[in-house]
């Protein structure tokens, strides 16, 4: 089990949580967090917030990478190596942002699964049928809303790798062809890359809106 970004908010508990991580025991993690006053519902909201933030950062990163690529293609003189280095740095950052997005989505799935399993099992503990029905209705609504959220997040995530692949190709080509002729040969790629990045941004923004709505409903 990975370290949820939520840990960063609780520095006093790092040693305890690190121990749990070493055991790889998800159940022990949740039990310990509940003893510390953090229940699965709160952990799910925190994980969704972390995932939302990672997608916002990834969106900004790819916008920045596109700008750096345009700067290389619009090269009119000066230090071409410097522009290449900046583009390569943007690609490296994009790779890191992409990994963070994937990890945060997995964190959301881990907590959601634990929450819904617990919630479902607790329905049998009710003696009051009206309360049981009300709880089940809320569970079904939350699960439906969650499915919409995770679908949007994964749809956005799937757009990342194709964009990274294109940027990776351009950077690799430029690495050994830092000259005006090589740059000119990449001009035809710009429209395609812009289209891919724009599509990614739209999916990211849709996912972020879903996260905002989910957080609001869970609050």
Where are these regions (language model features)?
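Immediate post-signal-peptide N-terminus of mature secreted/exported proteins
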Residues: 28-94
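Compositionally biased, intrinsically disordered terminal targeting/sorting segments
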Residues: 28-33, 64, 68-71, 103, ...
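Long, heptad-repeat alpha-helical coiled-coil segments that mediate oligomerization
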Residues: 40, 47, 54, 61, ...
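Amphipathic alpha-helical membrane/lipid-surface binding segments
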Residues: 33-36, 69, 73-76, 80, ...
């Amino acid at each position: 089990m990975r370290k949820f970004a939520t840990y960063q908010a609780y520095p006093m508990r790092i040693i305890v949580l690190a121990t749990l991580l070493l055991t790889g025991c998800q159940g022990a993690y949740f039990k310990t967090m509940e003893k510390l006053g953090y229940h699965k519902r709160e952990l799910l909201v925190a994980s969704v917030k972390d995932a939302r933030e990672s997608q916002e950062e990834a969106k900004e990163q790819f916008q920045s990478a596109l700008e750096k690529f345009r700067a290389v293609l619009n090269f009119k003189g000066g230090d071409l190596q410097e522009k290449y280095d900046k583009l390569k740095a943007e690609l490296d950052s994009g790779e890191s942002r992409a990994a963070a997005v994937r990890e945060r989505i997995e964190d959301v799935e881990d907590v959601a699964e634990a929450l819904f399993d617990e919630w479902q099992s607790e329905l049998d503990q009710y003696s009051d049928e009206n309360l049981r029905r009300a709880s089940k209705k809320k569970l079904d609504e939350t699960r439906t809303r969650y499915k919409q959220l995770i679908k949007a997040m994964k749809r956005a995530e799937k757009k990342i790798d194709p964009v990274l692949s294109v940027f990776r190709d351009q950077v690799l080509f430029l690495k050994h062809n830092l000259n005006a002729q090589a740059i000119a040969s990449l001009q035809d790629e710009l429209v395609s890359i812009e289209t891919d990045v724009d599509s990614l941004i739209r999916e990211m923004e849709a996912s972020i809106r879903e996260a905002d709505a989910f957080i609001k409903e869970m609050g």
